[in-house]
Amino acid sequence: MSKTSAKSIRPGELNLKEKLVHINRTAKVVKGGKRFGFNAIVVVGDKEGHVGYGLGKANEVQDAIAKGVEDGKKNVVKVPIIKGTIPHQIIAKYGSAKVLMKPATPGTGLIAGGAVRAVLEMAGVRDVLTKSLGSSNPHNVVKAAIKGLKSISDANDVAERRSKSLTEVFES
């Protein structure tokens, strides 16, 4: 029995693009000197409401990026985007990284820095105000941004949870 549900996302059917967020060089000290390795954080998305992130580790930069892309394709989530922005304000925390995202009017642009900008660009969000608080570690900032985007509830979900119609939700 397969576990595929109506909400499962097949990354093979999406036109995913990738964006490199951060490359880190690590060193292992061995008898003959230092062995260098690399890890890469990559954000993948179709700029139409699907986004994911991946972490790849390898001895070469290109291999680490390729592994990150493959990992990112396995972690794709759907983001509800309304008129180019998010439906409501979000505060998400992962580790000591905290990300605040606020919806913005059309024409505002994507006001975000570093890792959060990459996540929102790949998701297809065009107008949003963000602030990254706490740790600036790209690993945790990306995870906090994705966690926040996952926690977005669109109007249909809210209406379903409250056992009301869509119009009743907006009237209250």
UniProtKB/Swiss-Prot annotation:
Keyword rRNA-binding in annotation: yes
Domain S5 DRBM: 16-79
InterPro entries (UniProt xref): Ribosomal_Su5_D2-typ_SF, Ribosomal_uS5, Ribosomal_uS5_bac-type, Ribosomal_uS5_C, Ribosomal_uS5_N, Ribosomal_uS5_N_CS, Ribsml_uS5_D2-typ_fold_subgr
PROSITE patterns associated with the record: RIBOSOMAL_S5, S5_DSRBD
GO cellular component, one term: small ribosomal subunit
GO process annotations (BP): translation
Example GO molecular function: structural constituent of ribosome
Keyword terms of this UniProt record: Ribonucleoprotein, Ribosomal protein, RNA-binding, rRNA-binding
Entry keyword annotation includes tRNA-binding: no
A Pfam family recorded for this sequence: Ribosomal_S5_C
UniProt family annotation: Belongs to the universal ribosomal protein uS5 family.
Free-text comment about domains: The N-terminal domain interacts with the head of the 30S subunit; the C-terminal domain interacts with the body and contacts protein S4. The interaction surface between S4 and S5 is involved in control of translational fidelity.
Annotated function: With S4 and S12 plays an important role in translational accuracy. Located at the back of the 30S subunit body where it stabilizes the conformation of the head with respect to the body.
Subunit-level organization: Part of the 30S ribosomal subunit. Contacts proteins S4 and S8.
Name of the protein in its database record: Small ribosomal subunit protein uS5
Source species of the chain: Chlorobium phaeovibrioides (strain DSM 265 / 1930) (Prosthecochloris vibrioformis (strain DSM 265))
Gene (UniProt): rpsE
